[in-house]
Amino acid sequence: MKTFVAKPETVKRDWYVVDAEGKTLGRLATQIASRLRGKHKPEYTPHVDTGDYIVVINAEKVAVTGAKRTDKMYHHHTGFIGGLKSISFEKLIDKKPEMVIETAVKGMLPKGPLGRAMYRKLKVYAGTEHNHAAQQPKVLDI
């Protein structure tokens, strides 16, 4: 008996919409990352992108536990000397609410070309409106 290996051209990808309102950030991000990788499918193959498309709405209403709302910091470097920039969760959720979920999910995906391809299938929106109605996304309860 041979092991089944999925081929990129035969993979069937579905569209799902996830409502992030009131959901804990980390628990939501792990489920989204798993769906983007395709680990929920029986034909999952590690070196093939078998995941689905995920549309996340209400990113501005995602929840965090404890004191993370004020204490959690996001860091990035500009590339210049002394260019370490930091922003708190509270300020980032006001400024760019999509980036909070995008950063959490991106850190849970593989690093490299395959991980970047998986990340491109994630669409995050701050409010309830999204422009993917033509794809007829199914509601995914997480």
From Swiss-Prot:
Coiled-coil region: none
Cellular component GO terms, alphabetical: cytosolic large ribosomal subunit
Cross-referenced SUPFAM superfamilies: Ribosomal protein L13
Quaternary structure, from the entry: Part of the 50S ribosomal subunit.
Superkingdom in the source lineage: Bacteria
Record's function text: This protein is one of the early assembly proteins of the 50S ribosomal subunit, although it is not seen to bind rRNA by itself. It is important during the early stages of 50S assembly.
Similarity remark: Belongs to the universal ribosomal protein uL13 family.
Any one GO BP annotation for this protein: negative regulation of translation
Pfam families (alphabetical): Ribosomal_L13 (PF00572)
Keywords: Ribonucleoprotein, Ribosomal protein
Species, as recorded: Photobacterium profundum (strain SS9)
Protein name (record): Large ribosomal subunit protein uL13
GO molecular function: mRNA binding; structural constituent of ribosome
Gene: rplM
